[in-house]
């Protein structure tokens, strides 16, 4: 495994007996290790909550007498010793899955680039599922012992904080992160000065300093352009995610791709595999080719070498969702770069140029990534098919089904998303070592042995816990923000911990159709308010600040939530983040997902919910098209695509209401057995857990990346061909 380059100074005033709390605070291992959070919360639970579960702020601010009391508490010290021992063993482990199976490659670095990483609520460096997946990928790579090193950005303002106004409009509040208050460490040179990397921009040099996060055994390096030597505009390059400003965006992606390669070189890494998580980092292929050409290799040889060791994962099933830059902008930013590749302007543009029937030609980042990758993949079976069709123009001589864009279906990091009580139940019935065998189907068959009453008891506890959390959240809004009483009700203060509860939480993009269930609002209200069979629905999610249709969708949903006829059975929870997501995926009974097929590349929130005993109710798109077996959840609509979106919406809405009214609600409220248990519901819950948990976890997913993509790239020998950019005619 890699050595960390930044070493945290223990600047906390801690009793000697519990001195290693400072070390634990600076490694995110504690965030996914059972009982590790208790090392902080048991010192002072109120202060822990007030810190936002930030161990750096907590240890800096907690009263000294609380620390002294913990250091003298025998039970606490026993827990501390056990977890410190486990942490030390984890970091030094020589017997990892990767080392056992592939010992020849344990010192061959794999570089993983992503524009966002969702690791914990204290690090708001993510906008949605792409970042959460990247964060889970790092955690599982650490668990499996993959020699991964990651590169991304640390954003000065993080992602925005969301507030919903009385009329339902999303207000975006920016805040500045204080990096010294986060579990991130600056990289310093031998003189104690910040290490920086530079990238040439038009008429100036962009500088970025480097930070490091310890994700278990995996180092994550983060680029930060907010340094004094940059002009004001360049200092803002890493201020926030996904700017709509094209000038800023191309400079940002140059920093990630080109600057990221240079940063790894400066730190002494020589990755053998380069993995691009989406196209934002595709310039890394150009930088590696430039290095090789400047070292004396031909462009042909450089291109083949870079391609042989590069992997591109695409997550976007629609062309409009991919980054493309106008040619004049590329000309402006790369006019001094292409000569270092031995290319002229036309040859450089042909690397990734695209013609558009009714518009100006562009420079496509996914095209660049595909051309410089020996292997590419989508993130579900259906998405792989969609991606092969979308990018088939790049390989006109190959049949669509033979195009080498494979798929690896997404999964989730089990220990991050699993409720503690559910984890204890798994330990009791699956075995003490169950977390080491997450992809073992035979082990998961033991779910059927869990007594119904024990499983139901845990499920009821998790829902009560979620409802209590939501109510307390609403109470704080009332006290601290003076919101209108109707907004307090809309925030979930009237939720019933014993009613059938449906969750819908995700980024509010229009294709995700959060309003599909509201299409016939009168019918829905009737279903919600039947006295003996109450139903409640909890919505949560953010729209990108520049996504006006997404914000209008939130407003439509919020206005429906506020209607008095709902009786408080609809709720919208503002400021959705990882912390709220954990409560929801652990607490709801049914997880609803309504994307317009085939636009959901994969999705993972339903996988998290299934792990905790919720049952999926979803359109047959993304991962659910593979996961659904007819008895482990419910499908919305048919396994088909529509040419007419209005017909699709109508058909899917009718299917949704029909299943809800005639299958889901009756099954939950069926006549209970003498012990008060809904036996058939629990049976479907167990079938969901048994079939989904072993397949749709990050343990299986990262192993798939290793065996199907990383190892072939590690073993790859470049085959020299004459370098021929794609003909512009084929890019139209």
Where are these regions (language model features)?
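Catalytic cores of carbohydrate-active enzymes across secretory and cytosolic contexts
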Residues: 1-732
């Amino acid at each position: 495994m890699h050595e960390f380059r930044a070493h945290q100074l223990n600047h906390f005033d801690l009793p000697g007996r519990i001195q290693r709390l400072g070390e634990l605070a600076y490694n995110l291992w504690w965030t996914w290790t059972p009982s590790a959070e208790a090392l902080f919360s048991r010192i002072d639970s109120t202060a822990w909550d007030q810190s936002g579960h930030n161990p750096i702020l907590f240890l800096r601010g907690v009263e000294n007498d609380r620390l002294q009391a913990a250091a003298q508490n025998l039970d606490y010290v026993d827990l501390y010793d056990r977890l410190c021992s486990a942490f030390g063993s984890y970091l030094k482990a020589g017997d990892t899955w990767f080392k056992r199976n592939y010992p020849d490659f344990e010192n061959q670095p794999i570089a993983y680039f992503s524009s966002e990483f969702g690791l914990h609520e204290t690090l708001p460096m993510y906008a949605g599922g792409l970042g959460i997946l990247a964060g889970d990928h790092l955690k599982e790579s650490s668990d499996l012992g993959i020699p991964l090193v990651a590169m991304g950005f640390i954003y000065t303002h993080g992602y925005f904080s969301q507030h919903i106004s009385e009329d339902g409009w999303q207000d975006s509040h920016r805040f500045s992160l204080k990096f010294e208050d986060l579990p991130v460490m600056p990289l310093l040179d031998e003189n104690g000065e910040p290490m920086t990397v530079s990238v040439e921009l038009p008429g100036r040099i962009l500088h970025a300093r480097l930070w490091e996060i310890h994700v278990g055994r995996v180092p994550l390096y983060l680029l930060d352009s907010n340094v004094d030597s940059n002009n004001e505009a360049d200092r803002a390059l890493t201020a926030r995610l996904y700017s709509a400003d094209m000038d800023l965006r191309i400079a940002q992606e140059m920093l990630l791709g080109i600057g990221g390669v240079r940063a790894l070189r400066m730190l002494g890494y020589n990755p053998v595999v380069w993995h691009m998580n989406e196209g934002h980092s595709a310039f890394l292929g150009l930088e590696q080719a430039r290095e090789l050409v400047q070292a004396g290799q031909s462009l042909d040889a450089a291109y083949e070498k870079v391609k042989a060791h590069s992997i591109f994962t695409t997550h976007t099933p629609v062309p409009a969702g991919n980054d493309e830059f106008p040619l004049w902008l590329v000309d402006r930013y790369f006019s001094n770069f292409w000569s270092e590749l031995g290319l002229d302007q036309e040859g450089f543009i042909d690397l990734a140029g695209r013609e558009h029937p009714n518009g100006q030609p562009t420079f496509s980042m996914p095209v660049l990534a595909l051309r410089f990758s020996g292997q590419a993949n989508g993130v579900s079976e259906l998405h792989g098919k969609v991606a092969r069709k979308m990018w088939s123009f790049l390989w006109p001589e190959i049949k669509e089904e033979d195009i080498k864009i494979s798929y690896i279906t997404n999964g989730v990091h089990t220990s991050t998303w699993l409720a503690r009580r559910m984890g204890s139940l798994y330990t009791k019935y699956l075995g003490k070592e169950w977390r080491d065998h997450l992809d073992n189907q035979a082990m998961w068959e033991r779910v059927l042995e869990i007594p119904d009453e024990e499983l139901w008891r845990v499920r009821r506890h998790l829902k009560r816990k979620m409802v209590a959390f939501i109510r307390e959240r609403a109470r704080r809004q009332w006290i601290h923000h003076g919101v209108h009483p109707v907004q307090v009700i809309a925030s979930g203060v009237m939720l019933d911990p014993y009613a059938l509860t449906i969750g819908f939480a995700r980024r509010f993009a229009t294709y995700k159709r959060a309003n599909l269930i509201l299409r016939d609002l009168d019918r829905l209200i009737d279903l919600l308010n039947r006295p003996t069979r109450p139903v409640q629905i909890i919505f949560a999610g953010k729209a990108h600040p520049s996504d006006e249709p997404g914000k209008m969708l939130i407003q439509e949903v919020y206005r429906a939530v506020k209607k008095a006829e709902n009786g408080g059975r609809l709720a919208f929870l503002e400021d959705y983040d990882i912390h709220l997501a954990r409560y929801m995926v652990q607490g709801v009974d049914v997880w609803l997902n309504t994307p317009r097929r085939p636009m959901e590349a994969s999705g993972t929130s339903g996988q998290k919910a299934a792990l905790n005993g919720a049952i999926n109710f979803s359109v047959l798109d993304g991962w659910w098209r593979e996961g659904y077996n007819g008895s482990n959840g419910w499908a919305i609509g048919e396994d088909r695509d529509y040419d007419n979106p209005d017909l699709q919406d109508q058909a899917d809405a009718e299917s949704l209401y029909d299943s809800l009214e005639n299958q889901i609600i009756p099954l939950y409220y069926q006549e209970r057995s003498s012990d008060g248990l809904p036996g058939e519901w629990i049976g479907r819950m167990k079938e969901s857990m048994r079939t989904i948990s072993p397949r749709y976890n990050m343990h299986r997913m990262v192993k798939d990346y290793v065996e199907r993509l990383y190892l072939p790239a590690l073993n790859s020998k470049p085959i020299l061909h004459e370098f021929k950019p794609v003909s512009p005619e084929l890019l139209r």
